[in-house]
Amino acid sequence: MVGLVYYSSRSGNTARLMERLGLEALRLPQTEPSPEVDAPYVLVTPTFADGEGRGAVPKPVIKFLNNSRNRALLRGVIAGGNRNFGDTFALAGDVIAKKCNVPVLYRFELAGTETDIARMRAGLARFWAAQEQQTCLTQA
């Protein structure tokens, strides 16, 4: 089971974050056909917004989420961005969360810090434990 799916652009910031995070993850391709997932996952994505917030969600992420199966298995989103862009910082997370009715679990800047990595690891562990507990309760 892959519990993380991520997209990283040519800048590689999100890829560097994911490498340091050290958890199994599926990387979305930039141009190839989108994969289809078969288990619940958290999406990690950068933000690409213009000054008005348009285009915040990268096109490969949109393509991936346009697959209804992929969208149905999405459980949360972690978004990256650059604080220099003010209100559009990590905006992709807010857009995806609203459209897919999932929580934004965390926001990080550029390739993240060691504090971000520690918080993400701990937060994801708590999140998946809560998801497991919820699944067990609904199956009883």
Curated annotation (Swiss-Prot):
Matches recorded under Pfam families: Flavodoxin_NdrI
PANTHER family: PROTEIN NRDI
GO molecular function: FMN binding
Function (record text): Probably involved in ribonucleotide reductase function.
Family annotation (InterPro entries): Flavoprotein-like_sf (IPR029039), RNR_Ib_NrdI_bac (IPR020852), RNR_NrdI (IPR004465)
Similarity remark: Belongs to the NrdI family.
TM annotation in the entry: none
Annotated protein name in UniProt: Protein NrdI
GO biological process: protein modification process
